[in-house]
């Protein structure tokens, strides 16, 4: 990261599932705590895989979080003494999340968001591409392909061990029972043109 002379900016952490997005978000939050900065973490209510009131990485790291149903609910919890606002699983938030993040950064907060940049079909996911475009810093993480060991930038959804079809619902909250990291070449979506 570069030294910022002004307060208020946006950082995006993105990548496939199992690439370490939540782990990196937690790492950054812990660093702010060592610096005696005030941080608050948000997560969408829909994300209840490991905990309803924590952001939890796949390897078990966790940090307390405020679950919210709508993007604009974040404003109800932010106070002036906050320095850092973090939002995990940002792809699950409604379309207002881009405006919310912009407003917070413009008010002088360091805003860190983490989420999937592609859905299980390999297409841009939710508002993450817009957030990447307006961010001062973007960190794109990769996992390791569960099939061949190459860098994995895609998320493979599995249903009964088989790749999910292109027209299956976009949102299905799950972990290793439903998803695997895959590279471009091992990623499969039946009925999708290659």
From Swiss-Prot:
Keyword Mitochondrion: no
EC number of the protein: 2.7.1.21
Keywords of this entry: ATP-binding, Cytoplasm, DNA synthesis, Kinase, Metal-binding, Nucleotide-binding, Transferase, Zinc
Annotated Zn(2+) binding sites: 145, 148, 183, 186
Binding site for ATP: 15-22, 88-91
Cellular component per GO, a single term: cytosol
EC class of the enzyme, as a word: transferase
Location of the active site: 89 (proton acceptor)
Catalytic activity: thymidine + ATP = dTMP + ADP + H(+)
GO terms for MF: ATP binding; thymidine kinase activity; zinc ion binding
Keyword Kinase attached: yes
Localization, UniProt: Cytoplasm
Example GO BP: thymidine metabolic process
HAMAP family given in the database record: Thymidine_kinase
Assembly, per entry: Homotetramer.
Family as reported in the entry's similarity comment: Belongs to the thymidine kinase family.
Protein name: Thymidine kinase
Annotated organism of origin: Bacillus mycoides (strain KBAB4)
Gene symbol of the encoding locus: tdk
